[in-house]
Amino acid sequence: MEVLKGKVDCLPEETGYDSSRIEALNAHFERLIDKEIIHGAVYTISHKGKIIANASLGRGSAISQAQMQPDTVFPIASITKLFTTVAMMQLIEDGYVRLNTPVAEILPQFAEPPFNGITLWHLLTHTSGLYPDGGCFPESAPMNSWGLIDAAYRLWNGEGEFDWVKAGISGGLRRPVGSEWQYNSFGFVLLGEIISRISGQDVHDYIMQKVVNPLVMQDTGFAITQDMARRMFIRNEQWKEMMDAIIAGKPLQRDNSFWSKIPSTGGGLHSTTNDLIRFANMMLNYGCLDGNRILGRKMVERMATQQLHNVPDYCWGANEPNRLYGIGFDMRQGLDYTYSQGTYMHEGAGASSIDIDPKEQLAAVWFVPWDKGEWCPDPLYNVQNIIWSGLL
């Protein structure tokens, strides 16, 4: 299978990395493609601040034989939450709020029990107690925030402005605040609204101006440019039609409903592995990249520090008595992983992963679109093990 190689800064051996493990990585991806587990793969690996690998193989479309490219653009899904987290941390650094600021100080819908004990920290660590994403638990789907919003909108009499925040939390809490880790994307949507209200600026514009643009992430955005559309992974016919319209310069139908007012800060960004590796290296450099300061060193250290203690996790069949989680970042450890203690990461549905190891100064980002549409560990956990096996 042909492997297309992108631009690198140096050979792997120049940073103390065994290049034969890159070949092992390609072989692993080829096996997964042959088994129809993934359509293709694209990845970027950085070691000691230098890009040592950027390559792609397999298909860059779910509906054609178009080849995956080293600069393929894709939806990064929940990796978006890291950008939302950084934006929130910037506002904390600027003195507007603190991690333990009650959400009710910004969103009055949280002023009454049982919501009044929820802080920004709880939203950032998935411990607010709000009902989690659908699929986390068999019984959670009826209480999903999006379903609650939709149901409330159908009953809305049209007077005033529809309160999607109130509707989204109308199911109450599944667990007491701070008592259990439950993956909650809606919490990051709420953080997006909070960022907008604190900054006085649309949160999408804020993230682009304060995080994405200073990092010179030219292929990253909530909106899809013509150039991005030309290189977008095509997941279905409807997606192809949308990309074709963007390429042709045709205006997309504007969504003027209340849905368009809800922030896309839980999973709305598109990017490339090369752009995301710049974000990873900013974190490894304690908030700075190429002379541009995004965050201060102490804030990066706080984000990458284990936050939870004896807080259990039962999502998706887990049975962890002590969930390892930072601020915005997953810090999971266990037999599935070989990265260093203190590594922080995040997955994106569909699937993608960004893994950052401060001890080894190693970062990796990869996109592996599911072929059959079902999550499995081989394109994620196994890939991490192969990449980290190259350290000399």
Residue spans of the language-model regions?
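Generic C-terminus detector
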Residues: 371-392
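Short loop/turn microsegments at loop-to-beta-strand junctions
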Residues: 39-41, 52, 202, 350-353
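Short, conserved catalytic-motif segment at the N-terminal edge
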Residues: 3-6, 11-76, 98, 166, ...
